Amino acid sequence: MRYRKTEIWKSVDWITILLYLIMVIAGWFSICGASYEFDNVGLFDPSGRPGMQMIWIGTSLTLIFVILMLESDFFDIFAYLIYACVIVLLIATIFLAPNIKGSHSWLVLGPIRLQPAELAKFATALAVAKFMNGYGFKLTTVKNFSITLFLIFLPMVCILLQKETGSALVYLAFFLMLYREGMTGYILLIGVCAVVFFVTGMKYSEVMVGITPLGELIVSCLVLLITMGLVGSVRKDYISVKIMLGGIASTFLIGYVVSLFVPVNFAWISIGLVGAASIYLFYLSIRNWVWHYALIALFALGSIGFLFSVDYVFNDILEPHQQIRIKVSLGLEDDPSGAGYNVNQSKIAIGSGGLSGKGFLNGTQTKLKYVPEQDTDFIFCTVGEEQGFLGASAVLIVFGLFILRLIVLAERQDNAFGRVYGYSVASIFFFHLAINVGMVTGLTPVIGIPLPFFSYGGSSLWGFTILLFIFLRLDASRKER
């Protein structure tokens, strides 16, 4: 018998909805605290940000009702069409959007501003979920993996062309979902290594030990260690590991003895050892007809190539404001009144909140507008100042429970479409939370992404609400089958 739509309210996951409402309400109060002015005419006045956010919340509730009343098959049937429409909208935004703070990511329609990048997240998740739900789909085949990456990277490239780097980086969160669906963990390892090598190469690029560049030495030594670890873990070839370790140790020992008489660049010795290890691995690959050795060798050589490309990427590809933010985050440059101003004022606001905070509407740093973007990207510092460590911890706990609940719901799906979409949703929320909180506390560079359900803005709230409640509709439909 056809599942009755009136039963949707019984089958929908009310735990997730409760957590959603808690965060939306807490977010509205945080916006009130961040936007409060001494001559404020009223928190519900639509001319102010709290009043406007209340309107966005009301329209979001309407969106929730519409989504839950739709048949769950709607999202499967029209996934590609929704994705195509959003891609067209992203491309149009590149050419039609005005320059706002250096990016072309907002479509302005009279008093309304819309950021299509926020809507692209759920559209991409739907398209990827539909493709991976295909008959006989296996992520391990080159064709399927390539098409999946294309679906993820196409909107990412469009958003990069809008000069909205922060929103584009969010799409890297899909790799967490791909890992759950069978992608090898070595791809995640490559991503982690790229970040570590970039940060290390940048932070110690100008530090010299004698004539040895410390950054190049550290990275090349890490490459050697990881290469030997991969040979041992992937192939269980401990004899080759011992041979490589012996060669590396003896070469460094000889270099040390020589350095007692003449200056020696140990970085070049280490890089040379990476090359020698790669040649040895290629030899093993050809001799034993095992392609794993060749892949490990390519990883080692690619890592060294990446190391030498760091300066080019940093100086010629990244925008000047991005370069300054990275330098400030790594401690390479002190700019308390420039690029580092936001983060410094944010940390002052959070620190001044103490254990229990200054109370609602009593935050001096936020009330006096010391923190730029304090009701959008830096909204978390308002929580820290007004509610203190306890309030900030409570917000993180609620977010943690929310993401864990999404994972539980994703795992209980009876088809790949719902599971893939669910893990995409959980991954996106996790990425936003980790980067935004890290950004506000100075742990990560400032890339300008909102804190879900807390940051001011209709596009952000709508985007996250649609993203979430499509999944809740898919989850509720399990009882229809």
Description of each model-found segment:
Residues 225-229, 442-479:
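Transmembrane alpha-helices of multi-pass inner-membrane enzymes
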Residues 164-169, 357-363, 374-376, 447, ...:
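Transmembrane helix boundary and interhelical junction motifs in multipass membrane proteins
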Residues 8-9, 145, 368-371, 413-414:
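Helix-boundary and loop/linker segments of multi-pass membrane transporters
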Residues 350, 354-387:
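Long extracytoplasmic/lumenal interhelical loops at the membrane interface
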Residues 150, 339-343, 356, 372, ...:
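Alpha-helical membrane-protein architecture signal
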Residues 1-10:
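Short, Lys/Arg-rich, polar N-terminal cytosolic tail immediately upstream
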Residues 19-22, 28-30, 37-39, 43-337, ...:
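Hydrophobic alpha-helical transmembrane segments of multi-pass inner membrane proteins, especially
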